[in-house]
Amino acid sequence: MGKRDRLSGNEAVAIALRQINPDVFPAFPITPSTEIPQYFASFVANGQVDTEFIPVESEHSSMSAAIGASAAGARALTATSSCGMAYMWEELYIAASNRLPLALALVNRALSGPININCDHSDSMGARDSGWIQMYAENNQEAYDNMVQAFCISEHRDVRLPIMICQDGFITSHAVENIELLEDAEVKGFVGEYEPENYLLNPECPMAVGPYSVTDFYMEAKRNQAEGMKHVEKVVLDVAKEFAEMSGREYGLFEAYKLEDADRAVVMIGSAAGTTKDAIDKLRAQGEKVGLLKIRLYRPFPAEAIAEALKNVKAVAVMDRAEGYTNHGGPLGSDVMAAMFRARSTALATNIIYGLGGRDVRVEDMEQVFADLQTMIDNDDAGETYRYMGIRE
């Protein structure tokens, strides 16, 4: 039986990591993820974990050390945000290309510049094509639950790829909520012991990691990565089913909130989904058929399942907390619209950029989004398909 506690998102993730008891945790602090290694360091000092905690001199080094540990056969992870992630950019691709199932606790923060320490998704969206699995949390409970499930997904023999567990900086990382924790023994049994398939410290099977790859081999290596990513959706669902049996909390590739009979829908990632649910409840009480599709698994992108979930809506607003600089749409908008196009959807669609640099998202803002969708339906015209919400003109 689990217990209820009042925790910030960062502390919840740190507790999940204590329960997992990884082998190696290299870390370098950066706001707003600093508290994760800070809390974890206290667990190390108090003898609550056996983890080799390595304070390093930079984020590039923290990911490099995690890669080295994982290549040697250890269960490894690190944590970072924003410019710290940018500093380890080169290493993100190294981890993925070497099929190392390490984890990154990413607390989403705007990339500079101008310099900003608040939330948006520009850091993780910039790395969306690096070969990492990406999962996002709406609230502190989901941040904890996703972290518990992370290694079960990344270490699966059909996957063997690194995973990012993302939550919104300050909005969830520092805000305190009541959440339900699992018992330590439950998490330990659920995650299990790491059994590396190929690793450097195996005298029975000598191998090289990350050798120079010439034209004859590079493309096959990339195809191999892509094949591993194709298995992720099924593994995520299988792990979620096992997690639900243990915890009673159900997860999928996304959450469809009051979407069954909706004629207007919002698609989004992260904490603003909670605000959107409040707006939906208010509008539903007034008889309006509105709903939400909240993305949990963003990479790989579950295009077919998302298109199927949206097949009956008349108008969709895809909300991006990151600018794409394409004159076409943000990252999520481009992916969702492509999925709808392939499914031959006739729904009107628009892409809305919102919340950059931590700008607040209010219930009234989301009510206006649904009102704009109704206008699109009434006029049978999507109008401006690349918009901004809450911006001063």
Listing of model-derived features with the role each one plays in the protein:
Residues 1-126, 131-132, 148, 390-392:
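Thiamine diphosphate
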Residues 8-13, 241-264, 277:
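Glycine-/acidic-rich phosphate or pyrophosphate-binding loops and their flanking alpha/beta elements
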Residues 36-39, 65-67, 88-92, 113-119, ...:
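Short acidic, glycine/serine/threonine-rich loops at helix termini
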Residues 41-46, 278-292, 341-342:
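Short helix-loop-beta junction
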Residues 118-162, 166-169, 345-359:
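Conserved thiamine diphosphate
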Residues 320-393:
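Peripheral docking tails and interdomain loops at the edges
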